[in-house]
Amino acid sequence: NLIISETLKQYVYSFKNKKILSTKQNFGNISLISQMFQRCYLKESNTGAFFVNLINNKQGDYSRYIFFYINYLIENKKIEEAKKIAGQLEYINSTLLLSQSRSWIENGKFKEFNKIFSCNNHNDIVSEFLFLVSNLYSSQNDFENSNFYFNLSNYLNPNFTFNLSLIAENFYMNKEYIKVKEVL
């Protein structure tokens, strides 16, 4: 809970003061993700490097953040760079989110990215953090907390329907098949 509250304080500080809090606690990769999104929100020039460092981090699977990097590139009119990254994604070996990203790029539907997430929207950023927390709880089979944080995340950004797969998986793991069907 300390990690959650401190990270949320950092976000609020950044949103309110338009800068990153200089004295902050380090929570490892969660802090890297949070700094990346804060820099994206603040439109800092080194934001792209933060995305690349996270995506290439060997300490875990951060492929989800390829979507946010492509989104960032599109918001900043770097379409050719976004196309290059999307072109490296494989439909078969990628998540639904990344496969959809590639499809949108290939079909020139760049505005679709902004319909579900924007670095300019503080609700979207906090929603993604809460989704990360939900995912962490789910990986520990703590589905009650996972669902709680998922619902907060979904409230802040109901347009990010790709996240519904997590709640469906949580229901499935709890053998709540009727709820899985409702989500799908």
Each model region followed by its residue ranges:
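Alpha-helical solenoid repeat scaffolds
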Residues: 1-184
